[in-house]
């Protein structure tokens, strides 16, 4: 709610943040693009009711047309239907992996930032250990070892989803932990925190009421970066054949299937690669805009 100072209404912090975000034209445009993609993958299959696994060899490798706006693959399957279905999975993996990374990283960073001595040192040693590990070989190894047991336990699609989200999120929390720890180390010495501590407020309430809310800006920005990184990681795993099963058309899997037909059916790879490119680019620009909006010192 606007505050009146000296007879002049001052915008609320949320309004000021929105005004700074609107100045970042690429971030605003990227928000519109990402929102359009989310609406398309969420509601598109309800309007475009072509089954994703319908095979029509008479229409194989067709280019874009009225009946198949994105063309078809080598089995004559409609690429628009498969892109809409796969977009749900790719974006869901990105968002879920981001939540895992944010929750784990924020928890570890908060404990390290509030603790002293051996606890802080041990958690930072653990963070440095994970940062030193080569992520891609370990991703491949973990998925190779645990994919089949999880498939048998909860089914091929959900089991693969859980495994990929856990693995990607498990290798993205370290940067968040370091960022949160630095914020906590800075904020815990501020006057308003010292005043609350002097009034007898417990450490848990200090964190939840004062320190964590003032650290949300950098955490949100880190979350947007993690979404983009998770989408790329899932697409990479699917392209290498270690992601979802072949009958589940994620964007990375569609790109993998298109690699042998680049010369005769370039539209196949173009739409899959374009979906990944637009999603990742939009999220990165949104992250830039949020960084400038949430931290006025970085905005020009």
List where the protein language model places each region:
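Gly/Trp-centered helix-boundary motif
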Residues: 1-106, 110-111, 118, 132, ...
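Generic hydrophobic transmembrane alpha-helix motif, especially the helices
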Residues: 69, 79, 103-104, 113-114, ...
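Amphipathic cytosolic juxtamembrane alpha-helices at the membrane-cytosol interface
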Residues: 77-92, 96, 112, 116-124, ...
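Residue-level hotspots within pore-lining transmembrane alpha-helices
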Residues: 88, 130, 134, 171-174, ...
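Short alpha-helical transmembrane interface motifs in multi-pass membrane proteins
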Residues: 89-93, 108, 124, 162-166, ...
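Hydrophobic alpha-helical interface/terminus motif in multipass membrane transporters
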Residues: 111-112, 142, 146, 180, ...
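Helix-loop interface residues and adjacent transmembrane-helix termini in multi-pass membrane transporters
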Residues: 114-118, 158, 224, 239, ...
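Non-cytoplasmic
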Residues: 137-141, 145, 165, 169, ...
């Amino acid at each position: 709610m606007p505050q009146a100072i000296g007879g002049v209404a001052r915008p609320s912090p949320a309004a000021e943040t929105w005004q700074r975000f609107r100045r970042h034209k690429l971030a605003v445009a990227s928000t519109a693009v990402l929102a359009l993609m989310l609406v398309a993958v969420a509601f598109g299959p309800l309007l475009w009711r072509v089954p994703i696994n319908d095979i029509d060899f008479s229409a194989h490798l067709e280019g874009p047309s009225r009946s198949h706006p994105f063309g078809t693959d080598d089995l004559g399957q409609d690429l628009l239907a498969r892109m809409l279905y796969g977009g749900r999975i790719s974006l869901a993996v990105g968002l879920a992996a981001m939540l895992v990374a944010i929750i784990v990283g924020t928890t570890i960073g908060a404990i390290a930032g509030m603790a002293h001595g051996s606890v802080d040192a041990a958690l930072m040693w653990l963070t440095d250990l994970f940062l030193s590990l080569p992520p891609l070989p370990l991703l491949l190894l973990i998925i190779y070892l645990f994919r089949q047991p999880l498939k048998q336990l909860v089914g091929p699609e959900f089991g693969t989803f859980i495994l990929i989200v856990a693995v990607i999120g498990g290798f993205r929390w370290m940067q968040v932990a370091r960022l949160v720890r630095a914020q906590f180390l800075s904020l815990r010495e501020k006057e308003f925190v010292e005043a609350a501590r002097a009034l007898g407020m417990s450490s848990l309430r200090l964190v939840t009421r004062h320190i964590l809310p003032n650290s949300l800006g950098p955490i949100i920005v880190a979350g947007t970066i993690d979404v983009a990184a998770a989408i790329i990681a899932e697409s990479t795993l699917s392209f290498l054949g270690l992601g979802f099963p072949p009958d589940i058309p994620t964007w990375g899997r569609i790109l993998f299937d298109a690699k042998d037909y680049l010369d005769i059916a370039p539209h196949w790879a173009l739409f899959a690669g374009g979906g990944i490119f637009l999603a990742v680019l939009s999220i990165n620009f949104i992250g830039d805009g949020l960084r400038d909006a949430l931290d006025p010192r970085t905005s020009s």
